Curated annotation (Swiss-Prot):
Interacts with CCR5 and GDE1. It comes from the Eukaryota. May be involved in ER/Golgi transport and vesicular traffic. Plays a proapoptotic role in cerulenin-induced neuroblastoma apoptosis. One of its GO terms (biological process) is protein transport. Keywords: Endosome, Membrane, Protein transport, Transmembrane, Transmembrane helix, Transport. One of its GO terms (cellular component) is postsynapse. It is found in: Endosome membrane. InterPro entries: Prenylated_rab_accept_PRA1. It is a multi-pass membrane protein. This is PRA1 family protein 2. Signal peptide: none annotated. Its main location: membrane. Residues 63-64, 120-122 are extracellular.
Amino acid sequence: MSEVRLPPLRALDDFVLGSARLAAPDPGDPQRWCHRVINNLLYYQTNYLLCFGISLALAGYIRPLHTLLSALVVVVALGVLVWAAETRAAVRRCRRSHPAACLAAVLAISLFILWAVGGAFTFLLSITAPVFLILLHASLRLRNLKNKIENKIESIGLKRTPMGLLLEALGQEQEAGS
């Protein structure tokens, strides 16, 4: 296995401006929609990481303790999901067949915990909103040839990226590159 590397930052023109082609996904074909989202998450991961980082930095500047607590709760909740999927077959099957529901459950549990300690608004602003916008962009952005080639390289294991490892931990490794 090769080392984990962050792919290059994609041009703003490719990401959201001129050459970016957006279209609503077909809700009648959820498998194709899932492939589009996963492949866009892999291809634009550096751009998404930058957007998420800016959002976290802004929220951290405004409410540092709640932002840190929000990030910690989400990391722990994701860790529990990965651990449960590794030790229990039923959770593993659920994680593979319903990844959106698992992500929603992690975010809902995190929101409930943070609501109890008074940090729900910061959580919604610093974590949930950027995740929603990233998933919205990944759902709407049509793939181009360069995107497909990069995803094939990732899927055959010639190149490892942080998003590829995260998707693998969430049980979506078989979807990537399709």
